[in-house]
């Protein structure tokens, strides 16, 4: 029996072998189904913010690259090899709106656990995202992972 039916694991380009080992070990023990959310950093470009945000776009220069796809595929393959149902998602988000993007995805997927395992922004960014999750969905469990870099 697993503690969590669905988990959302957030990672970014700073993930390393220790990150993958922690995710594999924790999820194989505790999760039936895992959604890996790779966060591709987005940077705001002057002059584009007003126009693009007005039409509902991100407003930055983020682009999903083959490296992003390879990274999320590596996590998905790792978890699938452990016998879990594993899925991958890539989102682009600037640091200031990362929390909203994560919470929106977690709610859309109906997860009961969100694991914050991204490194960009450090502990302060993870604390902010945790507050956003608790404020919008107090029944969702949140696991804040220690830095691996």
Protein language model regions, located:
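Residue-level detector of structured alpha->beta connecting loops
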Residues: 31, 110, 137-139
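Conserved beta-strand segments of the P-loop GTPase G domain that flank and frequently precede/overlap
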Residues: 9-12, 36-39, 89-91, 114-117, ...
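Short, hinge-like loop/turn segments at secondary-structure boundaries
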Residues: 52-55, 105-107, 132
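Glycine-rich, Arg-bearing micro-motifs that act as flexible, cationic patches
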Residues: 113-138, 149
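A short acidic, glycine-rich active-site loop
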Residues: 55-70
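Small/aliphatic-rich secondary-structure junction motif
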Residues: 2-57, 84
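Structural beta-alpha unit
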Residues: 1-2, 80-114
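A short acidic, amphipathic alpha-helical/loop segment
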Residues: 21-25, 101-102, 128-132
